[in-house]
Each structure stands twice: as structure tokens, then as C-alpha cells.
UniProtKB/Swiss-Prot annotation:
This is Probable diguanylate cyclase DgcQ. Its EC number is 2.7.7.65. Pathway: Glycan metabolism; bacterial cellulose biosynthesis; Purine metabolism; 3',5'-cyclic di-GMP biosynthesis. Homodimer. It is a multi-pass membrane protein. Binds 1 Mg(2+) ion per monomer. It comes from Shigella sonnei (strain Ss046). The keyword Signal does not apply. Residues 433-568 form the GGDEF domain. GO terms for biological process: cell adhesion involved in single-species biofilm formation; cellulose biosynthetic process; negative regulation of bacterial-type flagellum-dependent cell motility. Substrate binds at N449, H454, D458. The lineage of its organism: Bacteria, Pseudomonadati, Pseudomonadota, Gammaproteobacteria, Enterobacterales. GO terms for molecular function: diguanylate cyclase activity; GTP binding; metal ion binding. It is found in: Cell inner membrane. It catalyses: 2 GTP = 3',3'-c-di-GMP + 2 diphosphate.
């Protein structure tokens, strides 16, 4: 147990944490660590630049979208403002109609024709629009239609007045294709004239069955606000898709009818193309409130849709939480913004190929190339320096080993042995453990050299060193101190234990024959002297070695090939 304890304590003392760290973190590991830190920091800085660049790219996409959305909103707002103006004029006309003879005549004419299947009242084609209507019988068949109101005459004159305003408001430069007032009392006024009276019922019922009319009932539109509706063409129809902005006309809590303006989708498509900067890439798409595709600025998708149902669902989910934003879909960046004066959303789609061709793409490519170049140079530098450090470390280790070891026997040389012995002796003295020394000298070695040559002598020394090393304990230290003489240090071993080790060495040396030439073998022997600190309490290694050396010569005088552990031969 004492031997095991000394072994453990010896290792704990000699292998301090600094030495352990130095052994584990050799020069190669330090170089690797430094280059890894540099690579991580360079990658982190590059990543930070990428994040800043991405934020700038997203802001740029939103700014481009906002510019187009604002331009489209202004035009739509202009039409909404006209619609509100017309409604206010209609309300004033309902409350205080103009007392013109022509208007009174129009009311009289209505009373004369109201029972006819279809009728038209026209004052002056250059100044106002005609009022087109159906009979009382047809009106009574509709659920939302009614002529049972006290202000029916005022509504007729108000319709003629608003027809005059509609003609003035409608012009070729406007986005609006048709402006109209449709009454629940069975008549309508439209900027698109009805050429034949027989077409009036069909056209009227086409109006009152549209969502933009039905959607303004007091149950459907309780706030009586402006609403937008989309009409999609049927499969077999030639009707062009359009959006309709409409507003209810009420007075004294009675719903009279609906004012509306229809804008063709092709007109909005043309406006989108005109509003976009020609130097910018990206596609703009207009959707209604239910994310139904209306139009696109891309000629390749005039009536198509580049989003599949899953992507539309993702887009709808993102739009639930904000009025503007962006989302990545595969290699595309999709930004969107809800319009203020249209019940829909404007979407901008920017593909990866378009981004690469743009300014941000050029900066991203340059940044990537710089990072790749820096990383490549860093790796090349790491490889060169790592090889240099590795070679220097190997050379240093080789020189250090040669400085501490005997190259022939591969045991410690004299200087290294003394360096090892002193701290071991001091440690044993501190813990009051024995410290023993064995001196070994090969018998008749000079005769072997003289008879078989120095090469044979070198082989004998190497053979003997191997046998000595194989006979020692793990904590023992052996070295060649000169010529054919060896020294063994045994920390924690008593004199008796050291003598047993010495006897084991002697037996191993003597019992094995050695081939030194063709058909020539020899058997070697050795004389050994043993000393220990137990005898005198002296832990001085040089004194113990001198004592062991003296006993070695006593063994030689006693006939060689023996162990001497006392001064009595």
C-alpha cells in the first residue's frame, strides 16, 4: 500500500496542472485554436453584415411596394371621393329637389309610364343622363325592391340631377368605366346608355342581383360605408373582370338605392405598369379581400397566379396580424400592403434571380466572395503554419529526447537520471518513505568488446538495457551512467524489496543466451550493488549511489554475477 501511495503522490506532484495543460495544449493545438477563433469571428462579422444587408433589402422592397401602393391608392381615393360627393348631392336632392319645369315634367312622365314593362325618361342628352325603369309589377317581384315611399317623386328628380353630375364626373382619363345609380324603386341611371328600351329590364335586374347592390342592404352594411366588390367572369361569358366601388344612398333612415363605379381590371393592370419604375425588377399583383387574383404587372401573368393554395394560406395567415409585411417563400421574397381606399391587398414578388441582378445581389456576391477568399487564405495559412509548428515540435521533441536519453540503450543518460532522482528522493523524504538505488555493472564486458568487436558490445548493452527495463516496476527509473554501468532508482522500495528487484535483474541477464554472430552465442552476467535510505536515513541520491557502487565492487570481488545489499560481502 505504501508503494502505491508513493506512486500516486509522485505523479500528482510532478504533473502539475500547468504541465498537464502544456502537454494537452501543444503548439499544434494552440495554432488550431487561434485559427478557429479567427475563422469564427470573421464568419460572425460576415453574418452580421448579411443581417444588415437583409434588413436593408427588406426595407427597399417595402419602399418600392409602398410607392406603387400610394400611387394606386391616390387614384382609387379620387374615385371614392367622387362617389361620396355624388351621394351627398343625391341626399340634398332628395330633401330639397330643384323646382324646374323639366323636372316636374319628368315626374309626370314617370307617372304615365310606370305601369309599362320598360320605360325611359330623357330630358337633354347633352346635359343629363336618361332614367331607365321597369313596371310596378316587376318591382313587386323583388325582395329588396319597393316603390312604396313618399319621396318617390323626389327620387326621380334626384336621379336626373345626379345623372348630370355623373356625366360631368365621368371622363376618358378616369379609371372608371361606368358610373351608375340603381334605385330600389325600379329604375337606374348609368353613364353607359341603354340604346333600346327592351333591354332595360335585363340590365336593371343585372344590377340589382349583383353583390355590390345586395351587399348594401341595412342588414349587410350596417355602417353604411363604402364597399368594394369583385366580379369574376363566368367560364362561358365574355364579360371582363372588374371591381366595383359602391355606397348606399339613405335619407331619413330609408334606403333608396346604390351609387357605384365599375373599374375594369385591365385598367388597373395598365395603371400598375405605368406606376412601376422601369429600372426595378419584381412583379406586382393585386388581390381582393378574399385573396382572389385580380391583375398583375407582369405580362406573363395577366390572368394567372404564381401562388399555389398552400402559399396563399401562408400569405393569408401573415396578413391577419398586420396591414403590411413580408414573407419568404422558397427563393422568392413576397412583400404585401393593404390599400387604404380599396378592400384588397397589393403584393410584390421578388425572385432570387432578380435579386442577384440587382444592387443588393451584387453586394451579396461581393461579400460572399470576400468571405470565401479570406477563409481560403486563412485555411492555407493555417495549413502552412500548422506544418511548420508540427515539424518544429517534432524536431524539438527529438532533440529533447536525445538530450535526456542514451541513444544506444534508450534509457536515461547520466544527467537526466540525476535530474529525475533528486525530486524523487526529496518526495520520499517528505513522506518518510524508503528510497533505494541499484548499481548494475556487466561482467567481463571489455573481453566481449575485445573478442567480438564494438558492434557486438553495443548489442550486448542494448540487450541488457531491455532486460533491466522489463524487470522494473512502473514507478522505477533506470539509466546508463557510463560504459557498461547502469543505475536504477526505486522510490518507495525498501532495501529488501530493492534486493529482490536486483536479483530479478541478475537472473534475467544470466539466463538468456544472446546471438552476437553467425553460430555464436554468449551468456552475460552482471554484478549489482543495492543501497537504501532505510539504512542511515540519508536521502542524498549521490551518497546512496556511491554506497551502491561500493557494494557492486564487493559483489565483483566475491566472484561476480551476484547481488550485494550490505557491506558484508
Amino acid at each position: 500500500m505504501g508503494v502505491v501511495r508513493v506512486q500516486h503522490e509522485t505523479k500528482m506532484e510532478n504533473q502539475s496542472w500547468l504541465k498537464k495543460l502544456a502537454r494537452r495544449l501543444g503548439p499544434g493545438h494552440v495554432v488550431n485554436l487561434c485559427f478557429i477563433v479567427v475563422l469564427l469571428f470573421s464568419t460572425l462579422l460576415t453574418w452580421r453584415e448579411v443581417v444588415v444587408l437583409e434588413d436593408a433589402y427588406i426595407s427597399s422592397q417595402r419602399n418600392h411596394l409602398e410607392n406603387v401602393a400610394n400611387a394606386l391608392d391616390k387614384h382609387l381615393q379620387y374615385n371614392v371621393d367622387k362617389l361620396i360627393f355624388l351621394r351627398n348631392g343625391m341626399r340634398e336632392a332628395l330633401v330639397a329637389p330643384l323646382d324646374f319645369t323639366s323636372l316636374r315634367n319628368a315626374v309626370t312622365e314617370f307617372e304615365q309610364h310606370r305601369d309599362e314593362h320598360a320605360w325611359q325618361i330623357e330630358l337633354n342628352r347633352r346635359r343629363t343622363l336618361s332614367v331607365n325603369g321597369v313596371s310596378d309589377a316587376l318591382v313587386s317581384e323583388g325582395n329588396l325592391l319597393s316603390r312604396e315611399n313618399e319621396s318617390l317623386d323626389n327620387e326621380i328628380t334626384a336621379a336626373l340631377e345626379v345623372g348630370y353630375l355623373l356625366r360631368l364626373a365621368h371622363n376618358t382619363s378616369s379609371m372608371v368605366e361606368q358610373a351608375m345609380y340603381v334605385s330600389r324603386a325600379g329604375f337606374y341611371v348609368s353613364t353607359q346608355p341603354t340604346l333600346f328600351t327592351r333591354n332595360v329590364p335585363t340590365r336593371y335586374y343585372g344590377y340589382v342581383t349583383q353583390p355590390w347592390f345586395i351587399g348594401h342592404s341595412q342588414r349587410e352594411n350596417r355602417h353604411r360605408a363604402v364597399r368594394w366588390f369583385t366580379s369574376q367572369p363566368e367560364h362561358a361569358s365574355n364579360t371582363e373582370p372588374q371591381v366595383t366601388v359602391s355606397v348606399p344612398v339613405d335619407s331619413n333612415n330609408y334606403w333608396y338605392g346604390v351609387l357605384g363605379m365599375s373599374i375594369p381590371v385591365r385598367t388597373m393592370q395598365q395603371f400598375l405598369r405605368n406606376a412601376i419604375d422601369k429600372n426595378l425588377d419584381g412583379e406586382y399583383q393585386l388581390y381582393d379581400s378574399k385573396l382572389r387574383f385580380l391583375t398583375s404587372s407582369n405580362p406573363d401573368h395577366p390572368t394567372g397566379n404564381i401562388f399555389d393554395p398552400r402559399e396563399l394560406a401562408l400569405l393569408a395567415q401573415a396578413m391577419e396580424h398586420d396591414t403590411r409585411g413580408g414573407i419568404r417563400m422558397d427563393s422568392r421574397y413576397v412583400s404585401w400592403e393593404r390599400l387604404d381606399h380599396f378592400d384588397g391587398v397589393l403584393v410584390r414578388v421578388h425572385t432570387l434571380s432578380e435579386g442577384v441582378r440587382g444592387d443588393f445581389g451584387s453586394i451579396s456576391i461581393a461579400l460572399t466572395l470576400l468571405w470565401a477568399l479570406f477563409t481560403t487564405m486563412l485555411l492555407i495559412s493555417w495549413y502552412v503554419i500548422r506544418r511548420m509548428v508540427s515539424n518544429m515540435y517534432v524536431l524539438q521533441s527529438s532533440l529533447q529526447w536525445q538530450a535526456w536519453h542514451d541513444t544506444l540503450t534508450r534509457l536515461y543518460n547520466r544527467g537526466a537520471l540525476f535530474e529525475k532522482a533528486r525530486p524523487l528522493a526529496k518526495l520520499c523524504q517528505t513522506h518518510q518513505h524508503p528510497f533505494s538505488v541499484i548499481q548494475v555493472d556487466l561482467d567481463h564486458f571489455k573481453a566481449i568488446n575485445d573478442r567480438f568487436g564494438h558492434q557486438a558490445g553495443d548489442r550486448v548493452l542494448s540487450h541488457a538495457a531491455g532486460l533491466i527495463s522489463s524487470s522494473l516496476r512502473a514507478q522505477d527509473v533506470a539509466g546508463r551512467v557510463g560504459g557498461e554501468e547502469f543505475c536504477v532508482i526505486l522510490p518507495g522500495a525498501s532495501l529488501t524489496e530493492a534486493a529482490e528487484v536486483a536479483e530479478r535483474i541478475r537472473l534475467k541477464l544470466n539466463e538468456k543466451e544472446m546471438l552476437i554472430a553467425k553460430s555464436t552465442t554468449i551468456r552475460i552476467s552482471a554484478s549489482l550493488g543495492v543501497s537504501s535510505s532505510e539504512e542511515t536515513g540519508d536521502y542524498d541520491f549521490e551518497q546512496l549511489q556511491s554506497l551502491a557502487d561500493r557494494r557492486l565492487y564487493l559483489a565483483k570481488q566475491a566472484g561476480r554475477n551476484r547481488v550485494c545489499a550490505s557491506d558484508n560481502a
